[in-house]
C-alpha cells in the first residue's frame, strides 16, 4: 500500500471545527496528504465522468445521491474522492487541492466545477459573485407549465429545520427563466436559467408554479424516483477560464434514466 493511500472509507476521521481550514470540515486523511485507494472499477468510473480537466480546474459529471462537499452525514464527498483519484492517477505526493466554488444538492445530477489551485478557486469565487459563470439546468415535470416560457419572480424564505424553502411575502426575491424544450408521453422538459441563487430555488419555484420536479417528494412530486434522486440536471456551464482567459463550455450528458429525452 502506497504512502498516499489508506485502506478504506472506514479510515476517515474529522478534525475539530477549530482545526479545519477556513472554519470548514476537512478530513484527517486529506490534511495529512493520505488518500484511500480506489478500486479499478471506481477509478475507471471517476475517470469517465471527468468532463474537462487542466492544471487549474476540473469539471465533473455528478450522479444523484453524491455529495459535493463534506456534511453532517459523514459520507465521502466528491471533493475527497477526486483528491484520492488524482493522487492515485498522478502518483502525487502530499496534499491534493480540490476547491469547491459551487455545490449541487445531493439529489441533483450534472455539471460540478472544482478548482485545482487556490488561485483558481479565488478567481472562480469572484466570477460567481459577479455573475460571470453561466449555468443552465434541465428539469422534468409531470405537469405542463402555464406558459411555454416565462420569468418567475417570487419571494422565498428558507426553513433551516426542515431544509426546505417556501414562497412567502417576507422572503428574498428569487427570479428564474424557464422554457419548455421537449415533451414526452408523460413528462415535460424545462430548461431553466437562474437570475438569483436561493436555497432550492428551482425546486421551490417550479413547485409553486404547479410543476414539481419528477421525484421531488419534498416539493410535491407524487412519487419518488427509483434512484432516490430528482430529475433536475445541471446541464451546461459556460465561462471564461480564470487563468487562460479562453472560453470554457461544457455540457453534461442526459441521465440514462431520463427515457425519451433527447440530449
Give names to the regions the model predicted.
Residues 2-12, 24-263:
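RNA pseudouridine synthases
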Residues 17-20:
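Cationic, amphipathic, low-complexity segments that mediate targeting or membrane/lipid association
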